[in-house]
């Protein structure tokens, strides 16, 4: 709401006198809200935003422009944008009725022009943005995102802000290798399982991570280590020699969280995965 004031001056015969000051309030007819459907984000994933413009006036508001700062934040002497508009993702509804897509400038910042909000009604704008390498993946990090609506019929720009938080979760991959790759009967062979965590939280015992494998050919006389520490059958792992079925006991596999580094020049984040290694050696 904008408060205005003014005062009159009366002059006569070289004299001057001032009136009282009067005050008024310029009521805003347009309000805006912004909501992220997901609420959290992951690197490389899409965030869906819903912007609702509500017109409480008796006249339609036309030719409005919406600008989205795509989460821009200062870095060095410039600005970094952790979100990238996803091309052709925009949908517009006026009082629930689909509308033609408006003109879009991907930016950053994102610009959407030619928006109309009906009298006594609302216009909903839905679009997506992809999380890029300028967004921090660290646990607790946020992207604060603001839209600004301008245009004729508005006393002042109208803004709305939404915050999404980096999703706190591990993200695991596993790679298996064998050495040697060519063996003969009664020769030892070693399988190595490399587990990598690119997520921002560790895998702990209560996550109950389990590795299972069926060795073919079947192995005997197993020697199992995890991160260089010997494991005992029936305690940290189980093995059925008749079938070759191997499995770790739930909760024995733990993996540290990844670490993230922001380049001091480019501002881009890089990831160093947390790792854990399981080795299984046996006789063919």
Placement of each model-derived feature along the sequence:
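Exported/extracytosolic protein signature
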Residues: 1-284
